[in-house]
């Protein structure tokens, strides 16, 4: 077949396949157009997840009738001067969105400029079917109906209305977060699901669009490096989710899903969260336009940086410092949830197993009183011998000051240990409430921070094995261990290659005590294999250190003395990140004294 030009309608449908893959993609393009038009208020209405209908209305600058004709042609835009492709400042610039959408749906475009007349133009799957005057205020209204109705090959790949709605909601939420100066509303099937006012600051907009708990469990980020600025909020490691759906990343006000940024985020939380847990973040990166390329993909969700290592280092280092400064904090949500779930239950009196004596009546009461009887005087004498605590003992002598008074809880943030529950949890009394500590999680963090100091140059003491242990593994695992041998030596693990499918372990960290050497090395090999290239070797070694810390920590089920419990509390108070274990779970929670008093009806 000879080479020929493709028909314009087919070209538009091919372009639509890149730009408009689902209703959420079409919605993103329309809302971005509204933002670029200078809108201060954007209203979005969708039906059946956007499959049946999408409507975006704004109060931006609007278009004339002549501009509306050009807007529906490919590669026609007002946003890109001839020489500005390297310095794009608008969200859209390709001039492909409207014609691409109009080629696979019925699109109604209505617009009016300040002081001009409203105009309406209707395009059905690439063909203009109607146009004429329209009644509306300044701004633009775009209605998209029956998306992919005439492209069954694309429509059958759409998901359920609920899934498509969730994707549309995510698009609006991200764009609303990027522009706190603009008001947004979203209605789905006639029900308003989102409404935020313009003029908010970034932190206020993020809180309004995410969880109310985030404000109390987050850290502010504000960092400058030359002309690059990084701002936003990040959650405490203990405030995390099972999926990464609450990670909002923006570059120059543009929502992106970039592998470099996601990898940097994982690196910052590397030894603070388990692999299957994810922080809640909203990060805004402002970079000179010449240092970033947004013209990578038609959907404009990917970017390329001129100096990616600078950006990655800034994110990892900046977030690490912010987390270090708040390492003692623990999430407050568990304590509040526990308090809400704590319900008062009536306490039934224990069944009577002995004598009940009413001194006022001078008689004994017992279930078998009809069969057994004693003189009242004898009953009273037996009762007093069995229950000596019913009356206070007479005072004798004089009061003496204790030689070693109990320590005051006010002297320490985590209080003074008062006991242990289930050989797992330390109960401490603080100045302003009750503190409960997970002994294994807390000690795990303390061991990890010691190992990390070893990686930073303060060598971790090791203990040589009397008989070196050979651990058999597959060859790729041995290769990874051999490559990381120097880093592992700083952590106190000394090993060397022992043939193609084994390594010989000569020493382990002294602080871990007697451990299962085979299991430790196997877990280290799995950790080195389990993290992709988005993390550097040092970051992966920190994750290895987290695994080692778990092997050598105080286990749940071990009875601790009061001195051991207090020593653990004091060490926690001076250790970075002691508020969470290596898997992102809290190491301690606090029940404020006011909450305790409310439980007993005192407040």
Swiss-Prot record:
InterPro entries: DNA_mismatch_repair_CS (IPR014762), DNA_mismatch_repair_MutL (IPR020667), DNA_mismatch_S5_2-like (IPR013507), HATPase_C_sf (IPR036890), MutL/Mlh/PMS (IPR002099), MutL/Mlh/Pms-like (IPR038973), MutL_C (IPR014790), MutL_C_dimsub (IPR042120)
An annotated GO cellular component: mismatch repair complex
Disulfide bonds: none
PROSITE patterns: DNA_MISMATCH_REPAIR_1
An annotated GO BP: mismatch repair
UniProt cross-references to SUPFAM superfamilies, sorted A to Z: ATPase domain of HSP90 chaperone/DNA topoisomerase II/histidine kinase, DNA mismatch repair protein MutL, Ribosomal protein S5 domain 2-like
Entry keyword DNA damage: yes
GO terms assigned for molecular function: ATP binding; ATP hydrolysis activity; ATP-dependent DNA damage sensor activity; mismatched DNA binding
Keywords tagged on the record: DNA damage, DNA repair
A Pfam family matched in the record: HATPase_c_3
Annotated CDD domains: HATPase_MutL-MLH-PMS-like (cd16926), MutL_Trans (cd00782)
Purpose: This protein is involved in the repair of mismatches in DNA. It is required for dam-dependent methyl-directed DNA mismatch repair. May act as a 'molecular matchmaker', a protein that promotes the formation of a stable complex between two or more DNA-binding proteins in an ATP-dependent manner without itself being part of a final effector complex.
Family: Belongs to the DNA mismatch repair MutL/HexB family.
Family annotation (NCBIfam families): mutl, PRK00095.2-4
Protein name per the record: DNA mismatch repair protein MutL
Biological classification of the source: Bacteria, Pseudomonadati, Pseudomonadota, Alphaproteobacteria, Sphingomonadales
